[in-house]
Amino acid sequence: MAEPDPDIFDEDDEAILAADAEADADFEAGRTVPHERVGEWLKTLGTPHQTPPPYSWRK
């Protein structure tokens, strides 16, 4: 019998560890967005005045 197709809920431990390491490195390097800026951005979603995500550290 063939193996089932991967599910979005299947866990790939290596991918999870790699994503965690990348997130930790971003945090340690100060590549974060303040909570307040994210909240302001979220309020614009779905409105005529929607703004792009606040990637202040990606200049």
UniProtKB/Swiss-Prot annotation:
<feature type="compositionally biased region" description="Pro residues">
    <location>
        <begin position="50"/>
        <end position="59"/>
    </location>
</feature>
<feature type="region of interest" description="Disordered">
    <location>
        <begin position="38"/>
        <end position="59"/>
    </location>
</feature>
<comment type="function">
    <text>Antitoxin component of a type II toxin-antitoxin (TA) system. Neutralizes the effect of cognate toxin RelE4, but no other RelE or ParE toxin.</text>
</comment>
<keyword id="KW-1277">Toxin-antitoxin system</keyword>
<protein>
    <recommendedName>
        <fullName>Antitoxin RelB4</fullName>
    </recommendedName>
</protein>
